[in-house]
Swiss-Prot record:
Disulfide bond entries: none
Highest taxon in the source lineage: Bacteria
Location(s) in or outside the cell: Cytoplasm
Organism name: Gloeothece citriformis (strain PCC 7424) (Cyanothece sp. (strain PCC 7424))
Function recorded in the entry: Involved in the biosynthesis of lipid A, a phosphorylated glycolipid that anchors the lipopolysaccharide to the outer membrane of the cell.
Main location: cytoplasm
Protein name: Acyl-[acyl-carrier-protein]--UDP-N-acetylglucosamine O-acyltransferase
Family of the protein in this entry: Belongs to the transferase hexapeptide repeat family. LpxA subfamily.
UniProt GO cellular component terms: carboxysome; cytoplasm; membrane
Documented EC number(s): 2.3.1.129
Class of the enzyme per the UniProt entry, highest EC level: transferase
Amino acid sequence: MLINIRPGDAPLSTPIHPTAIIHPNAELHPSVQVAPYAVIGEQVKIGASTIIGPNVVIEGPTEIGVGNRIFAGAVIGTEPQDLKYRGAASQVKIGDHNQIREYVTINRATGENEVTQIGNNNLLMAYAHVAHNCVIEDEVIIANSVALAGHIYIESKARISGVLGVHQFVHIGRLAMVGGMARIERDVPPFTTVEGNPSRVRTLNLIGLKRAGVNEAEISEMKKAFRLIYRSNLTLKQALEQLESWSNNPYVQHLRDFLHQSTTVTGRRGPIPGKE
């Protein structure tokens, strides 16, 4: 159950520092901890066992789930950095058991009732920026100083290395690995490793696949699919048509579907190509 907590009337078991500023209409579970000089605004809901570090700013409407750790200086729920924004009632939703490290910024969405959404068990390292309307699924790691532009979608268990920018509307696939300082302007296919400037698909993310429990037979079939897409003389359309007929591997199916949508769905940016 969520209850309204003010610094002056917090139970002794709930350490809310007296210098923290909490709006009377904010809703915090009794087990939430709030460090010195944090500011929690109106229309903010925070679930059980979440820890708010010093100098954190959380504006609403924002919902934060259970067991999250939000470190010093993070800023969540502020207005989008978007010239189209006209004060729409948008929000941020954050799931459970995330780590949001120092000075991370997460903006609200741009349009009415739209959401910037972060799932469960993610790690956002220091100085990462999550812009308006982004969606981050579960178990994603975003390293230091990664800047996500608006409307980016990141599937579960993707790994994004540090000091890079991702173009608006890009999709990053499941279990993809993006190398540090890459320039990401197009979609990153699932299960692949991408690096460089300009960025290129280099190989399958074999380490990530094995850690995720994908068996050797499935990986072997994925290697064949990868070679067909990126190492043959076929066009991407021809390769995807062949994959439709010979593989029931769910990982190959996901790769095929992702690439098909990347090239056919309006608003998608098309996939990053293979190495030259």
